[in-house]
Regions:
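C-terminal segments that line or cap access tunnels to active or ligand-binding sites in enzymes
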Residues: 153-155, 160, 175
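Accessory alpha/beta interaction modules
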Residues: 1-154, 164-166, 245, 255
Length: 258
C-alpha cells in the first residue's frame, strides 16, 4: 500500500474526538457554538469567533497549543480540548491551560476585576472522575460552609464513555462512533459526514495529514539541530522516548508558523 493510500485509510478512521478532525471542524464557529450550547446548557449561547490550535505562550515556562479557543457573546473565553487517552494528570492540564489562556488575554496593568472570565471544556473518551456521569462541573466551594464561590474560572468535563441518554451523551456518540450522526446536532453531524464520507472532505483531511506529517518532520529536525548546537544532549535523548517533552520543546523552540 502506498503512503498516500495509508494516509487515506487513516483519515477515514478519524472522528471529532480526534485532534485533527476536531481542529478542522472548529474552523467553523457554528460547530463550536452548537456543541457549547449543549455542553453549557445554554440554547442561546453565541460564539463570536473560534481559533483552532491557539498558541498559548509562556516565555518563562511551558507553552501550550489549545485545540480551540472561542470568544462567547457574553465575553467569556473558552478553551475546548479533546482527549482520547487517559495518559497524564488532565486536571492539572485543565488548570494550566486555563492559567495560560488567562495570562495571554490579560494586558499589563489590568485591574483584577477586569481579568477575563475563562472556561475550559475538556472532552474525553474516558470518564475522568469515574462517577458514571457524562457531564461534570467542578466548582470552587468553601469547605467550611459549602458555599460555591466564583472567581471567573470554570471547569467542565464531558466524556463519551458514559451513555446515560442525556443530550450531552447523544452528542458524544457523534464524537466517537464512526457511523453515528444525529439530526439534533446538524452542524456537527454535517461537518463530520463531509470529512468522513465525501471525496472533497476526505481529500482535505488527507492534505492536512500530509502537510502536518511533513511539517512535523521538519520541525523535529530543526529541534534536534538546536539541541545539538546548544549541547543539550540530555534533552535530545529524552525526546526520543518522551513525546510530551518533545512537543513542549517544539512549542518553545520551533513554534509553528501562523
Amino acid at each position: 500500500m502506498s503512503n498516500k493510500a495509508k494516509i487515506r485509510e487513516e483519515a477515514k478512521k478519524l472522528n471529532p474526538i480526534d485532534d485533527l478532525m476536531f481542529r478542522t471542524m472548529a474552523e467553523d464557529k457554528d460547530f463550536c457554538e452548537e456543541i457549547l450550547r449543549v455542553i453549557l446548557s445554554d440554547p442561546k449561547l453565541s460564539v463570536l469567533e473560534s481559533t483552532p490550535q491557539y498558541a498559548g505562550t509562556n516565555p518563562q515556562g511551558r507553552s501550550v497549543i489549545l485545540d480551540a479557543k472561542c470568544v462567547l457573546g457574553d465575553g467569556r473565553k473558552t478553551d475546548i480540548e479533546v482527549q482520547k487517552a487517559n495518559d497524564t494528570d488532565h486536571q492539572r492540564r485543565v488548570r494550566y491551560n486555563g492559567a495560560i489562556l488567562t495570562t495571554n488575554l490579560t494586558d499589563p496593568g489590568v485591574k483584577f476585576e477586569n481579568v477575563p472570565n475563562v472556561c475550559v471544556v475538556f472532552i474525553s473518551r474516558f470518564d475522568i472522575f469515574n462517577g458514571n456521569r457524562s457531564l461534570y462541573h467542578v466548582d470552587r466551594v468553601i469547605r467550611e460552609t459549602g458555599k460555591v464561590v466564583d472567581n471567573g474560572f470554570e471547569e467542565v468535563y464531558v466524556n463519551a464513555k458514559v451513555r446515560d441518554g442525556s443530550e450531552v451523551s447523544e452528542l458524544m456518540e457523534v464524537f466517537v462512533d464512526d457511523a453515528a450522526y444525529n439530526s439534533k446536532f446538524p452542524v456537527t453531524s454535517g461537518s463530520k459526514r463531509r470529512y468522513k464520507e465525501t471525496e472533497k472532505g476526505q481529500q482535505r483531511m488527507c492534505e492536512i495529514m500530509e502537510k502536518i506529517n511533513e511539517e512535523t518532520r521538519l520541525r523535529i529536525n530543526q529541534l534536534n539541530a538546536i539541541l545539538i548546537k546548544s549541547k543539550r544532549y540530555d534533552d535530545l535523548e529524552r525526546t526520543t522516548y518522551d513525546t510530551d517533552y518533545q512537543e513542549q520543546l517544539l512549542i518553545e523552540l520551533v513554534p509553528e508558523k501562523a
